[in-house]
Regions:
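Hydrophobic transmembrane alpha-helices
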Residues: 1-55
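Hydrophobic alpha-helical transmembrane segments
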Residues: 7-12, 36, 40, 44, ...
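Generic alpha-helical transmembrane segments of integral inner-membrane proteins
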Residues: 11, 15, 19, 40, ...
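Short helix-perturbing small/polar motifs within transmembrane alpha-helices
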Residues: 19, 79-127
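Interfacial aromatic-anchored transmembrane helix boundaries in multi-pass membrane proteins
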Residues: 21-34, 62-96
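N-terminal leader/targeting helix
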Residues: 48-75, 182, 187-189
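Structural signal for the C-terminal ends of transmembrane alpha-helices
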Residues: 48-49, 99-107, 170-176
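Membrane-embedded alpha-helical hairpins and interfacial helices in multi-pass inner-membrane proteins
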Residues: 75, 109-185, 189
Length: 189
């Protein structure tokens, strides 16, 4: 059974994913998969939540999108988005968030550099392993060709991984400080 605080964290991360969907995507003429900031939300979910919570927040987000809410970048929503070229990437979101969180929970010390490595490996590795073959199938092209088309996204994914790793460390430090203040009798504002 989830605690209320855990449910709130799941809901908050789901809302953040929806808010990031309001930022317009960047499309290229040669590939139908857009560049979005929602992968940054995936990274933050994995970095800030427990594995089960991270998985649940992204699954909840995808269920809301499947129900028709236009929360994906560009106002996309509905079950049809999962049968398009970006469907494999989307379906990999909960898996990637879970693996990121699971991996980070096993680190003895969390630094921005270690976070960056985990974020980059998981976001590029898991999302592309699931997304590229699905994209190839939907576009009726070879997997090798889809992989080459997807290489345009790697620099942006690395930039997002770097920015999110710094944000995650700062958020965790702020939360740890806040917890110390509460335990000392300070006010939680």
């Amino acid at each position: 059974m989830l605690k209320i605080q855990e449910m709130m964290q799941i809901a908050l991360m789901t809302a953040i994913m929806g808010i990031l969907g309001l930022i317009p995507p960047i499309f290229f003429t040669f590939t139908p998969v857009p560049i979005t900031l929602q992968t940054a939300g995936l990274l933050l979910a994995g970095g800030l939540l427990k594995p089960k919570q991270a998985w649940m927040s992204l699954l909840l987000f995808l269920l809301i999108v499947a129900a028709g809410a236009p929360l994906l970048s560009g106002g996309r929503g509905g079950i049809g988005v999962f049968f398009g070229p970006s469907g494999g990437f989307l379906l990999a979101y909960p898996i990637a968030a879970f693996v990121i969180s699971w991996w980070l929970n096993r680190l003895k010390k969390m630094t921005a550099l270690r976070l960056f490595a985990v974020y980059a490996l998981c976001s590029i590795g898991i999302l592309y392993i699931c997304g590229v073959p699905f994209q190839a199938m939907m576009m009726h092209i070879e997997v090798k060709q889809a992989a080459l088309l997807s290489m345009i996204y790697v620099p942006g994914d690395l930039i997002k991984a770097g920015i999110c790793s710094v944000f995650t460390v700062k958020i965790i430090q702020a939360m740890s400080y806040r917890k110390r203040e509460i335990h000392k009798g300070g006010r939680a504002i």
